[in-house]
Amino acid sequence: MADSRDPASDQMKLWKEQRAAQKPDVLTTGGGNPIGDKLNVMTAGPRGPLLVQDVVFTDEMAHFDRERIPERVVHAKGAGAFGYFEVTHDITKYSKAKVFEHIGKRTPIAVRFSTVAGESGSADTVRDPRGFAVKFYTEDGNWDLVGNNTPIFFIRDAILFPSFIHSQKRNPQTHLKDPDMVWDFWSLRPESLHQVSFLFSDRGIPDGHRHMNGYGSHTFKLVNAAGEAVYCKFHYKTDQGIKNLSVEDAARLSHEDPDYGLRDLFNAIATGNYPSWTFYIQVMTFSQAETFPFNPFDLTKIWPHQDYPLIPVGKLVLNRNPVNYFAEVEQMAFDPSNMPPGIEPSPDKMLQGRLFAYPDTHRHRLGPNYLQIPVNCPFRARVANYQRDGPMCMLDNQGGAPNYYPNSFSAPEQQRCVLEHSSQCSPDVQRFNSANEDNVTQVRTFYLKVLGEEERKRLCENIAGHLKDAQLFIQKKAVKNFSDVHPDYGARIQALLDKYNAEKPKNAIHTFMQHGSHLAAREKANL
């Protein structure tokens, strides 16, 4: 039985086999000093107290006390892998980025898949958006495409992000997941309807990480060598085919194998079944953006493919598992502001907010020198700047080079040729309310044209099955929003909720007391 286990289960066995006849390494302290006894503490006599001079114990325990680093506030549960991106189609007319330089070019990549709301020990099979972040190690520095498995998101204004995440996390008093919090926020922000509908559809629970698409989601800007710019969106579609889990299978796996997605990815790569995705872009000119029927930078909407077709670019291939999870996955940090020349941000409000939030959280979680950690290091570019010192400075701190700019001593110089693309911006400065920017048209298309009848049925069942645990006034607000999308959408959900709500008194838990004779009649009636 043990001989037929999968590579993930046999990791220790395989590690030993790889060492072949090598002798075991000499056991040492963190400082490299050999250890003579690792099984017994040093004491004054067999029953005496420990000695402070037992540096073997203190070295071990002091490090153990500091093993954990802060958990990611979102996307805490994840799996990672490494591979390459290969260009298959020329898009240099759109972008001068070296990653797209010529057909056949390969760029090393690191990828992290994740759920959003759960903690690091949560199940892989919950209904939740999936993170799908790609780090390209280019000659012009890292490019971090920090995407999801959906082309849209719940909100379009970055100031709402902390509250949105709080609503998906645990109640501050009970420390329980709270349907009131979840649905209260969603019902008060109807721009969430598109993503909520996607989330509760069949694609809300992907079958592992290999069978789902990825999307940059945001609108970006591409700039070519002539300084001409267009807006774009990034898509990466699975070559393994879309597969999703049923509600029943997902629930079963959450108990039987909560690490189902991580295990599936590891074993596929370990057995040479390398997963891949075909990489595409959509392109919109500036003039098209000006006449577009809605805000092209709205993260709650897509660009219709019939108007802005997918343009093939290349392939993402994953062919190496992490050597060590903590070193290469837990410490992996993605930052949307890492963009090499040829790729720039658009005015997308959510993207603009992430440009600050992501590097800020990495500095908190990993330290100000997190880009010196090997998995985050832009190893194909030479880093030269005026940043110095700080906790965990692990490199040479740029030696004796000047640490101020400008200077007269041949230190790193700015390069005018990589200046960002200029753009016009002269509107009034104020806080613009975007809450009611057509929250239903694309959701209606998704409900009526993208989904089939059986898919619509399951969508409504999934929504009602979750919404039923929220208070009635919240249910009413949510149903109103779904009805605004289409009367049939709201009516189906309401009909299912009516059944659930009718069953609630029957399923209520009653507490009975054996000795109630001393209670008043009113108190007895309340038992």
Curated annotation (Swiss-Prot):
Residues with the N6-acetyllysine modification: 233, 449, 480, 499
CDD domains noted in UniProt: catalase_clade_3 (cd08156)
Positions bound to NADP(+): 194, 201, 203, 213, 237, 303, 305
SMART domains hit by this protein: Catalase
Biological process annotations from GO: aerobic respiration; cellular detoxification of hydrogen peroxide; cholesterol metabolic process; hemoglobin metabolic process; hydrogen peroxide catabolic process; negative regulation of apoptotic process; positive regulation of cell division; positive regulation of phosphatidylinositol 3-kinase/protein kinase B signal transduction
Protein origin, superkingdom: Eukaryota
CC per GO annotation: catalase complex; cytoplasm; mitochondrion; peroxisomal matrix; peroxisomal membrane; peroxisome
Subunit description: Homotetramer. Interacts (via microbody targeting signal) with PEX5, monomeric form interacts with PEX5, leading to its translocation into peroxisomes.
N6-succinyllysine, modified sites: 13, 221, 449, 480
Compositionally skewed regions (Basic and acidic residues) per UniProt: 1-22
GO molecular function (one): NADP binding
Subcellular location field: Peroxisome matrix
Active site annotation, chain numbering: 75, 148
In-chain residues carrying the UniProt-annotated modification N-acetylalanine: 2
Record-linked PROSITE patterns: CATALASE_1, CATALASE_2, CATALASE_3
Positions carrying Phosphothreonine: 511
Catalysed reaction, written as an equation: 2 H2O2 = O2 + 2 H2O
Binding-site residues, heme: 358
Motif (Microbody targeting signal): 524-527
Protein's name according to its UniProt entry: Catalase
InterPro entries referenced in this protein's UniProt entry, alphabetically: Catalase (IPR018028), Catalase_3 (IPR040333), Catalase_AS (IPR024708), Catalase_clade1/3 (IPR024711), Catalase_core (IPR011614), Catalase_haem_BS (IPR002226), Catalase_immune_responsive (IPR010582), Catalase_sf (IPR020835)
UniProt-listed Gene3D superfamilies: Catalase core domain
EC code(s) of this entry: 1.11.1.6
Purpose of the protein: Catalyzes the degradation of hydrogen peroxide (H(2)O(2)) generated by peroxisomal oxidases to water and oxygen, thereby protecting cells from the toxic effects of hydrogen peroxide. Promotes growth of cells including T-cells, B-cells, myeloid leukemia cells, melanoma cells, mastocytoma cells and normal and transformed fibroblast cells.
Similarity section: Belongs to the catalase family.
Enzyme class: oxidoreductase
